């Protein structure tokens, strides 16, 4: 039977003959049209949990709660901050197999490159790794993670520093994995499409015993794909088993494993030919041009083990704990530019000849996360209280055996290699001729960008002149925090403080070990007022902190930072957020949010853009980002879904050692962006009842690159379309997704003339899914 109703957050949960009422969680399903039995089970599974143990059965674009934002599963409407959620249903409808494809649905979030690297509200991410189920993993960001095991992706805007460690000022991306369901469900899908891309995905779940106290879920995926870019592959497989044990109405446990192997290439972007200031032709080279060699590779193995435990002592007191252990290994061979052109004998750049380097890197990391907290619910008179007392730790060890060797620079006549060219000593350098021009001979063969030029793309270097064992390191963060939610009439006051202690030990367990320590007290306060049942207004203030030592390596070109001999060269990144907003429900069907904000950050770490030292870093004084966001999620009609957003970002440099930069726009930031996805099912039309259609639009206004202000990346609009068909009298569903239908040429980001990141041309993906 189909129903349309509200489900209260106070419900009875039966695991035996005894009903047990949990009153410590705020959870409400918005009025939607779906199966009543599924609705009941959804509310049950959400209500028993204070950490996520049981999965979500409802199948729509709306997820109105979050565990990670406050650790008390507040309704999103009551949160005094902006939280955007992309559910697995939207992920599946768009066939968004990579995280970057998921995040283009979120207002104010944009790709800065091909990597797992994003700008949120005009502020680029600094931290390496991913956050999974509220805990931080560590891995290089060059390949985007698969999403087949993801229940939803949450984006917390601003520094979510009270409940998470060392978060980025612009926002935090949290990936929530799929958990076991109470009923059997089996799903297998096979996809194939452009660029010789093939994917196989399986999702199996259900109970393992009659009493349904032991549940399982298994997600697996295999990807074999090329790219529109030359010499680029992205292959891998993913195995994610999960078990949930619920022996009684008070206790629950989940254990989970994620094993991910990826074998691809580091794609450093498209170089352009003959580029000069204000005379830059972005189409001077094909968007497929990649300077990497066919023999290059980027191989990683990532094993993550997780456990979550929750126990309710009574209806007022509960305890929650989570643990994560991660092992990560990397083996990389890479041919790339030095972000510069080869000079001639007079030291003038030759803008058709890219200076190259070759790197070999091996690394082994281990990560431990612990998160534990007590939750107390009580009343004093007319006031309702929910107090959280917690501790967490994050330990990241870089193991022995790591290295980053390189070949770059110029060859000298005595057989040595020097990092840079000095025209005053030109007689000491080996030379060669290029199109009638005398140039100092590079250690690694340069790449000729001239159309039709013959380039032998291989590991062509004379001397592996940089032998760099990566030092062992141990980075630890310990924190205690207190959070209090006070509810009185129509007001909710959410306040919290966090004391964090940080230590970075370089050359860990070696005689030359050195240590750097830092600490910070962080706080936040947010007030929500319920204007009506459907409308809340809020204001919030948050502070953030990142210790910029060996932990930071995500900024462009900072690959050598993880091998730095000092942990204390740079001041910590300090940030804060001020935000006002409105959250409401329009026409009882569409969740809408509107917010204005200001984010300030100080001591920003950026690349020095020094070709002789490509990994050199400097610090900028301060940036400021102000903006406005609005988002709509829900149903226009019962069969018509919508997910849309608009973002305006005014991000500027407010303090820099170069006075000419003060007041200028921040790099890689679009002022205006629009995202829209909508799906319509023809269920009300008998002749078309098995069909559905989808359409999406993404608009980004112009932006400037990271390392040069001499050219702009133009604004662009892309159109995506989808067609869905449920084969009658079978469990088979078919989907055809066409991305960039108009075959628009565009660039998502850039660093300089030699590293632009073009968007994919028109491409398609056909998917067949069988469900039981």
Task: For the regions a language model picked out, list residue spans one by one.
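Membrane-embedded beta-barrel scaffold of Gram-negative outer-membrane proteins
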Residues: 312, 318-324, 328-334, 571-635, ...
């Amino acid at each position: 039977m189909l129903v349309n109703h509200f489900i209260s957050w106070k419900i009875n949960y039966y695991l035996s003959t005894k009903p047990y009422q949990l009153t410590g969680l705020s959870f409400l399903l918005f009025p939607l049209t779906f199966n009543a039995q599924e609705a009941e089970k959804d509310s049950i599974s959400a209500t028993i949990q204070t950490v996520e143990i049981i999965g979500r059965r409802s199948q729509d674009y709306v997820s109105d709660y979050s565990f990670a934002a406050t650790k008390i599963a507040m309704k999103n409407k009551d949160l005094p901050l902006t939280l955007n959620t992309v559910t697995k249903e939207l992920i599946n409808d768009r066939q968004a197999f990579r995280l970057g494809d998921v995040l283009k649905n979120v207002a104010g979030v944009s790709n800065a490159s091909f990597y797992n690297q994003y700008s949120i509200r005009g502020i680029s991410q600094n931290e390496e790794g991913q956050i999974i189920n509220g805990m931080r993993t560590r891995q290089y960001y060059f390949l985007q993670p698969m999403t087949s095991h993801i229940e939803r992706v949450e984006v917390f805007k601003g520094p979510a520093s009270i409940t998470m460690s060392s978060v980025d000022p612009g926002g935090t991306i949290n990936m929530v994995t799929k958990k076991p369901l109470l009923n059997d469900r089996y799903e297998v899908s096979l996809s194939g499409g452009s660029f010789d891309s093939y994917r196989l995905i399986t999702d199996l779940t259900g109970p393992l015993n009659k009493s349904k106290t032991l549940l399982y879920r298994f997600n697996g995926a295999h990807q074999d794909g090329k790219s529109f870019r030359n010499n680029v592959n992205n292959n891998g497989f993913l195995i994610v088993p999960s078990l949930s044990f619920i022996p009684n109405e008070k206790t629950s446990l989940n254990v989970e494993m994620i094993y991910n192997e990826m074998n691809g290439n580091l794609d450093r972007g498209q170089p352009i030919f003959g580029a000069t200031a204000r005379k830059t032709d972005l189409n001077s080279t094909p968007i497929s041009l990649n300077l990497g060699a066919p023999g290059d590779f980027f191989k990683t193995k990532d094993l993550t083990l997780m456990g979550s435990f929750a126990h309710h002592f009574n209806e007022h007191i509960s305890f929650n704990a989570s643990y994560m252990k991660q092992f990560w290994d990397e083996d990389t061979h890479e041919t790339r530019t030095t972000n510069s052109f080869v000079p001639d004998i007079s030291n003038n750049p030759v803008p058709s000849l890219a200076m190259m380097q070759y790197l070999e890197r091996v690394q082994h990391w281990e990560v431990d996360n612990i998160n534990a907290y007590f939750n107390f619910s009580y009343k004093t008179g007319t006031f309702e209280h929910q107090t959280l007392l917690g501790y967490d730790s994050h330990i990241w060890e870089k193991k022995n055996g790591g290295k980053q060797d390189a070949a770059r620079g110029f060859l000298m006549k005595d057989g040595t290699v020097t990092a840079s060219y000095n025209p005053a000593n030109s007689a000491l350098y080996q030379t060669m001729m290029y199109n009638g021009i005398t140039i100092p001979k590079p250690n690694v063969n340069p790449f000729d960008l001239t159309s039709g030029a013959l380039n032998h793309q291989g590991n062509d270097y004379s001397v592996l002149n940089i032998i760099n064992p990566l030092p062992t390191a141990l980075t630890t963060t310990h924190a205690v925090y207190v959070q209090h939610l006070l509810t009185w009439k129509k007001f909710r006051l959410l306040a919290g403080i966090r004391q964090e202690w940080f230590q970075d030990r370089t050359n860990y367990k070696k005689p030359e070990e050195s240590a750097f320590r830092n600490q910070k007290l962080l706080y936040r306060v947010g007030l929500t007022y319920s204007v009506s049942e459907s409308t809340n207004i809020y204001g919030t203030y948050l502070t953030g902190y990142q210790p910029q030592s060996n932990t930071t390596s995500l900024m462009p070109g900072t690959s050598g930072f993880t091998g730095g001999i000092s942990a204390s060269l740079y001041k910590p990144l300090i940030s804060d957020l001020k935000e006002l907003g409105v959250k409401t429900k329009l026409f009882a069907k569409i969740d809408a949010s509107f917010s204005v904000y200001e984010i300030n950050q100080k001591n920003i770490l950026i690349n020095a853009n020094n070709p002789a030292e490509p990994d050199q870093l400097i610090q900028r004084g301060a940036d400021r980002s102000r903006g406005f966001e609005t988002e709509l999620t829900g149903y226009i009609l019962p069969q018509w879904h919508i997910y849309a957003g608009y973002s305006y970002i005014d991000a500027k440099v407010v303090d820099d050692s170069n006075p000419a930069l003060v007041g200028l726009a921040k790099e890689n930031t679009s002022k205006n962006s629009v995202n829209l996805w909508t799906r319509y099912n023809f269920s009300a039309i008998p002749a078309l009842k098995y069909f559905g259609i989808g359409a999406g639009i993404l608009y980004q206004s112009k932006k400037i690159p990271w390392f040069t202000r001499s050219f702009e990346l133009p604004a662009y609009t892309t159109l995506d379309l989808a067609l869905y068909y449920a084969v009658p009298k079978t469990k088979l569903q078919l989907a055809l997704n066409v991305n960039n239908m108009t075959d628009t040429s565009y660039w998502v980001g850039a660093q300089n003339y030699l590293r632009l990141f073009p968007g994919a041309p028109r491409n398609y993906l056909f998917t067949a899914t069988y469900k039981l």
